[in-house]
Structure formats: structure tokens, C-alpha cells
Curated annotation (Swiss-Prot):
SS bond list: none
Keyword presence, Metal-binding: yes
The organism of origin for this protein: Cytophaga hutchinsonii (strain ATCC 33406 / DSM 1761 / CIP 103989 / NBRC 15051 / NCIMB 9469 / D465)
InterPro entries attached to this UniProt entry: LytB/IspH
Cofactor binding, per record: Binds 1 [4Fe-4S] cluster per subunit.
Protein name per Swiss-Prot or TrEMBL: 4-hydroxy-3-methylbut-2-enyl diphosphate reductase
Swiss-Prot/TrEMBL cofactor(s): [4Fe-4S] cluster
Length: 293
């Protein structure tokens, strides 16, 4: 039995940067708060909590003053920065550069089309931290769509500008883009004049899709390691499952079922851009040490 970890799996640079910033700040001995889970992986959140990172939500942020708060890679809406200013909160800003660039693009688009009664549409997960930050650039006027059913939120009589959450699947984005184009045409509008789309998916994420397709085909079984909250994890696991029916999603090694693996199987281990390498190594060690039928 071979048990191989995908060399392309593990943190994207945005998550790696945020975790490094958190560890550097905690090394000074000063208290550090983080607005939301620093990464959508409960095992890593737990590891950093043991080092002293205190996770807070937006309601708790409103009660803080004179302290340090980390902004995670997902980014934040403008009101978070305003609140920090008012309450003398020092922000340690670990917003991913790719997300910040997207926020700026969305704000520029919104400023350009708002007077023309146009609509900013975001293909993403409602309530996701990154989407909250992006929608905040439009004063929360952006329309968030996740499924085809959500297209009914859009007024196809008015211009539409489409963006994507950076961690969504490329396939899903282009499917949504085609559906919107069709609906604009059905409304009797000129598609070129009334619809603009922007593929704002992070290339480190989209490049993982073809890599994972290839990786998944090379093994009898694929164990995909990710936090259940990870949007990117759900998308990439879907890619594995398309290519290899014997792909399984776990948060850690304790979730592996005995029936999944046979003694003669070659096993591939991979994960989301929010999955730490140490966790995949833990899964690898567990499989190698276990007796399989």
C-alpha cells in the first residue's frame, strides 16, 4: 500500500500569510483577537487558540476597545475599519491581496453603474466572510447568488455585472454566467451592453482543479481533508468525487471508516487551501499504521 500526500495541497499564500502574522503577533506576548475563525479548519483554529488567539464575532468586536484585532485573509467590509477607528482598535490586517484587489474592483464597478440603476451580482456563498466583505463595498446592495434558483433575485431589465467569490469553482461560475446571459437575452436586452462578467476566482484555487483531477485518477482511494466550513474544500472535494467515486471527505483521521480502504489500495491524500500540511500528515500516518482488510 502506498499512501501519498498531494504536493500541491495545503495552504494558499493568503492563509499562510494570515497564520504567520497571527503567530508573529502572539510571540510578542500581547493579547490578540481574531474576527472570526482565522481559517475554515477547526483543527488549526484549535491549535492557534492554545497559543492564545481569541476568536470573536462582530457583536463582540463592538464591545472591544484599546486592543489588537487580526483581520483574516477573507477581508472585511468598510464598517469594520470604521468601528476600529472609533474604538481605538489596532487592526492587524492579514486580508489576502487577491481579495483586496477584488474588493477594489467591485467598489469601482458599483460606483460606475449605481447611477445607471445597474446591479452587482456576486456568485458566492451567502453569509461567507469573504462575501460579506465584498458586498460591503456596495453598501450591501450586491445580489448574492449560489444556485440557479437565486437568479430570480436579479432584475434582467437592468444592467448586470457579475463577480465571483475567489474560492468558488470555475465550472460553477461559468455555468452561472451562461444562465445569466440567457436570461438577459430572454428579457430582450442586448447581452454585450447589459451584461459584464468578471472571473475573479483566485488562480491558486482554479489551478488546483486540473491538478486534483489528475491526482484523483492516480489512486484507488482519495481521502480529502478539509474543514466542513470551507467553501473551497466543498468545491475541490467535488472535483475529486467527479474523477474518483472512492473519494471521501474527512475533517481528521478519526472520521475514516474501515470500509473505505482495502489492504491492496493505493491511497491519495489531498485537501483544501485551508488545510494545514501537518493535518494531512497525521491522516497519512494513521492510514500507514492501521491494519486494513
Amino acid at each position: 500500500m502506498d499512501v501519498i500526500i498531494d504536493k500541491n495541497s495545503g495552504y494558499c499564500f493568503g492563509v499562510e500569510f494570515a497564520i504567520q502574522m497571527a503567530e508573529d503577533e502572539m510571540a510578542t506576548g500581547e493579547p490578540l483577537f481574531c474576527l472570526g475563525d482565522i481559517v475554515h479548519n477547526s483543527m488549526e483554529v484549535e491549535r492557534l487558540a492554545k497559543k492564545g488567539l481569541k476568536i470573536i464575532d462582530r457583536e463582540e468586536l463592538k464591545k472591544l476597545s484599546d486592543c489588537k484585532v487580526l483581520i483574516r485573509a477573507h477581508g472585511e467590509p468598510p464598517e469594520t475599519y470604521q468601528l476600529a477607528l472609533e474604538n481605538n482598535i489596532e487592526l492587524v490586517d492579514a486580508s489576502c491581496p487577491v481579495v483586496l484587489k477584488l474588493q477594489n474592483r467591485v467598489k469601482a464597478s458599483f460606483d460606475a453603474i449605481d447611477s445607471k440603476d445597474g446591479q452587482i451580482v456576486i456568485y458566492g456563498q451567502e453569509g461567507h466572510a469573504e462575501v460579506i466583505g465584498i458586498a460591503g463595498q456596495t453598501g450591501d446592495k450586491a445580489i448574492v447568488i449560489t444556485t440557479e434558483k437565486d437568479l430570480d433575485k436579479i432584475d434582467f431589465e437592468k444592467p448586470v455585472t457579475l463577480y465571483s467569490q475567489t474560492t468558488k469553482s470555475t465550472q460553477g461560475f461559468y455555468k452561472m454566467k451562461d444562465l445569466i446571459e440567457a436570461r438577459v437575452a430572454e428579457a430582450g436586452k442586448n447581452v454585450d451592453e447589459n451584461f459584464e462578467y468578471n472571473d475573479s476566482i483566485c488562480r491558486q484555487v482554479s489551478n488546483r482543479e486540473p491538478q486534483l483531477r489528475k491526482f484523483s485518477k492516480e489512486f484507488d482511494v482519495v481521502i480529502f481533508v478539509s474543514g466542513k466550513k470551507s467553501s473551497n474544500g466543498k468545491a475541490l472535494y467535488g472535483v475529486c468525487k467527479q474523477e474518483n467515486e472512492r473519494s471521501y471527505f474527512v475533517e481528521n483521521e478519526t472520521e475514516i471508516e474501515p470500509s473505505w480502504i482495502r489492504a491492496t489500495d493505493n491511497v491519495g491524500i489531498c485537501g483544501a487551501t485551508s488545510t494545514p500540511m501537518w493535518l494531512m500528515e497525521k491522516v497519512q500516518n494513521y492510514i500507514q499504521a492501521h491494519s486494513w482488510n
